[in-house]
Amino acid sequence: MKCPNCGNETSFQAKKCQNCNCDVTDYKKLVGRSNGLYNDALYKAKIRDLSGAIVSLKSSLQLNKYNTNARNLLGLVYYEMGDTVRALGEWVLSKNFQEEDNNADYYMKLLQNNPSKLNHVNSVIKKYNYGLAQAKSGNYDVALLQLKKVVSAQPNFVAAQQLLALLYMQQGDNEKAAKCLRKAQKIDINNTTTLRYLAELGLNPSAVRVDREIAKRNNTKNKQ
């Protein structure tokens, strides 16, 4: 772990920093809690509770900003939700805190060494931002057209699926809105915005979770 006073690498077993002699007893407790929250987030991410994972990871980083495992996972969660810009932001910060032996290098290179992927990301973000601006201005038809392009290009962009659903709801096309929300929920199962919109449509927010459990049981039976 890093000393909170001088930033020097210090043994987790030590009571004082070997470099500046700062007492790190209390700080070790914070680091331990930070790691616990990271493990909680890792579990939530595995069951696709990405929103819950984000909450745990942000709390983890508040306790220990040097927790690069937590920051890298936060970037991966954002990336899984289609928010590549935020993902890159977290990996850049992670690299600043830990220059050597950092998985953030690998994640960033996957994007930076693929110009077509970066161009795709930039195009999607521009369309989303334009669609969002048009929706706020009341130009719903234009916004709808832009958001349809966004989710077609990047189906896992949760925020875009939610906004498109909201636009469909505004038009009274609840069936299409529900389809967008179910797609968003399959990516992030407990997203509060998605659950709220589903409730407004009078739909069961647990349906995706139930479908997933049934699929797991069927797969188990088939293997037997």
Describe the residue ranges of each PLM region.
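Conserved structural position within tetratricopeptide repeats
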Residues: 25, 61-62, 93-96, 151-152, ...
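Helix-start (N-cap) detector for alpha-helical repeat units in TPR-like alpha-solenoids
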Residues: 34-35, 68-69, 102-103, 124, ...
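Alpha-helical segment of the N-proximal tetratricopeptide repeat
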Residues: 9, 30-63, 123-149
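Short Cys/His-rich micro-motifs in 6-15 aa windows
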Residues: 21-30
